[in-house]
Amino acid sequence: MGILGLSKLIADLAPQAIRESEMKHFFGRKVAIDASMCLYQFLIAVRSEGAQLATVNGDPTSHLMGMFYRTIRLLDNGIKPVYVFDGKPPDLKSGELAKRAERREEAEKALKAATDAGDDAGIEKFNRRLVRVTKEHAKEAKELLTLMGVPYVDAPCEAEAQCAALVKAGKVYATATEDMDALTFGSTKLLRYLTYSEARKMPVKEFSYDKLLEGLAINNREFIDLCILLGCDYCESIKGIGPKRAIELINTYRDIETILDNLDSSKYTVPENWNYKVARELFIEPEVANADSIDLKWVEPDEEGLVKFLCGDRQFNEERVRNGAKKLMKSKQAQTQVRLDSFFKTLPSTPNATNAAKRKAEEAKKSANNKKAKTSGGGRGRRPK
C-alpha cells in the first residue's frame, strides 16, 4: 500500500522536492531496487496483454523475461542495480495482509462473474488484482540475477527499509520503488518509474527527502507521524483526516500525541487500541541487515548458464538470450572504463580554452626565440676572459 496520498501532497506543497529526468540522467549511479515491486510489474504487464508467458508445463516466465530485459536496459544506461527482496513481514502488518487476502477473494468472485458475462475489461481488471509474487518467483529471479552478474540482497524484513538503509550508508544513490514508504524509512532519494517499460514513456520521478522536509516545514520525526496519519501498512488511520488536514495538524501540534489531546472527537474517530506508537518505531528502527556488512559486486555474466536456465523448458529464444548476455558483458566493460576514466579527469576543450592555449604557446615560442637571439648576440660581442 505504501503511504496514501503522500506523492500528491508533496507535489502540491513541496514541488521543489520532485524532479523528472530521463533514465540516462542516472548514468554511473548505483540504485537499490524493490525486487518484489518489479516482479509484480512484470507479471501484471503481461497479464494485461491477455496471456501469460509460460514454460512447457504452464509455469509463468513473464517475471524472468521482465527481469532479464529490464535489467539489461538499466545497465545499458550506465545504472548499476542491486535488487532487494522482502523477508518476513512485521507482525504489525498482519492486519493489512488480512485485508489483502479479503480483497483477493472478492477479486476471484468478480473475475468469475466477469468471465461468465464475457466482460473483457472486467476480466483484465480482476486478473491484475489476483497477481501475487510468490517465493518461487523470487527464487527464480535470484538465480537469474546471479547468472547475469547482478547483486541482490535478502532483507530480513521489509525491502523498502533495507533499500533505505543502503542509501543512508552511502552504498547506493537511491531507492527505486513505487511505494512511497521508502521515504518514511529515511531513504534520501526515491525513484519512481525507473523499471517501467520503455514503451510507457514515463520519465523517472525523483523525490528528495531533504527538500520535501523543507517544503512541508517538518522534521523527520514529524514526517513519520504525518505518514501514519495519511495511512500506512502498519496501523489504521483516523477516519475523516485527509492529506491536507493531516499536514495542518502536524504543522500545528508537531506529533500525534498532542494532536490526540486536541482532536475534536465529535468530528473524528480514533481507531480503538491504535498502534501508532509501534508503527512509528517500525519506521524509526526497522529490522534491516547492517548495510556496512553488505558487499555489492557486479561481475561478468555466465552466458552458457543463462542459455541453460532460460532456454529449453522456459522457451526463451537462444539467439536473443546470447545477444542479451553480450550486452551485459559490454555494459560491464563500459563501467570499468568509466571507473578508469574517473582517475584522469580532463577539462572540456572549449573554443576559448583552445585559443588561449594557442596564444600561450605562441608567446612561449616568441620568448624562447628572443632569448636565443640575445644569448647568441651576447656571445659574439663578448671578449674571452
UniProtKB/Swiss-Prot annotation:
One GO biological process term is: DNA replication, removal of RNA primer
Q: Does the keyword Cell membrane apply?
A: no
Quote the record's binding site residues for Mg(2+) 1.
Answer: D34, D86, E158, E160
Free-text comment on the cofactor: Binds 2 magnesium ions per subunit. They probably participate in the reaction catalyzed by the enzyme. May bind an additional third magnesium ion after substrate binding.
Give the Enzyme Commission number: 3.1.-.-
Q: Where is this region: Interaction with PCNA?
A: 336-344
Q: Cellular location of this protein?
A: Nucleus, Nucleolus; Nucleus, Nucleoplasm; Mitochondrion
Q: Where is the composition biased (Basic residues)?
A: 368-385
Entry binding sites for Mg(2+) 2: D179, D181, D233
- Annotated segments matching region Disordered: 346-385
One GO cellular component assignment for this chain's record is: nucleoplasm
Q: What is its main location?
A: nucleus
Q: Which GO terms describe its molecular function?
A: 5'-3' exonuclease activity; 5'-flap endonuclease activity; DNA binding; magnesium ion binding; manganese ion binding; RNA-DNA hybrid ribonuclease activity
Q: Where does DNA bind?
A: R47, R70, E158, G231, D233
What residue spans carry the region label I-domain? 122-253
Q: Tell me which cofactor or cofactors this protein depends on.
A: Mg(2+)
Q: Mind telling me how this protein is modified after translation?
A: Phosphorylated. Phosphorylation upon DNA damage induces relocalization to the nuclear plasma.
InterPro entries from the entry? 5-3_exonuclease_C_sf, Flap_endonuc, HhH2, PIN-like_dom_sf, XPG-I_dom, XPG/Rad2, XPG_CS, XPG_DNA_repair_N
- What are the record keywords, sorted? DNA damage, DNA repair, DNA replication, Endonuclease, Exonuclease, Hydrolase, Magnesium, Metal-binding, Mitochondrion, Nuclease, Nucleus, Phosphoprotein
For the region N-domain, what residue ranges are annotated? 1-104
The record's comment on protein family reads: Belongs to the XPG/RAD2 endonuclease family. FEN1 subfamily.
Instruction: Give the multimer and partner information.
Output: Interacts with PCNA. Three molecules of FEN1 bind to one PCNA trimer with each molecule binding to one PCNA monomer. PCNA stimulates the nuclease activity without altering cleavage specificity.
Q: What is this protein's function?
A: Structure-specific nuclease with 5'-flap endonuclease and 5'-3' exonuclease activities involved in DNA replication and repair. During DNA replication, cleaves the 5'-overhanging flap structure that is generated by displacement synthesis when DNA polymerase encounters the 5'-end of a downstream Okazaki fragment. It enters the flap from the 5'-end and then tracks to cleave the flap base, leaving a nick for ligation. Also involved in the long patch base excision repair (LP-BER) pathway, by cleaving within the apurinic/apyrimidinic (AP) site-terminated flap.
Under what name is this protein listed?
Flap endonuclease 1
What organism is the protein native to? Answer: Drosophila simulans
